[in-house]
Amino acid sequence: AMHSSRRIWCLDGDGAALMHLGAMATIGHVKPDNLIHVIFNNQAHESVGGMPTTSPAARFALMAQSCGYPSTRTVSTMEELDRVLSDLPGLMLPALIEVHTAVGSREDLGRPSIGPVENKTAFMDRWSNNRKR
């Protein structure tokens, strides 16, 4: 994010965010003005079996604020997420968006077998298809 003029989206799970809290402190310190950090909070380490995380006790937006993020939002519905995404051009960056979501994943979810570019394309296709519903 520091060496790019492009907007950078960091997509994180709650379990990963909890394990790497130092990253939030670094982001808050450096303040990259093109970074949007999204934490999908399903209160589980879903990709490795669904064990519960300690995120019910965690408030990621408050953590991000205390680390120096100028903008934070927490959403629980698609309508709230749509509003935040619409407001995004007016937010100071870096921004953190915590998305509360239910546990549940694709039946074929496994360990990564494709590269980041292919993952991005599949995510964008699925997101686009879900938004059309």
Task: Give a label for each model feature.
Residues 120-133:
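Short, flexible loop segments at boundaries between secondary-structure elements
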Residues 1-122:
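Thiamine diphosphate
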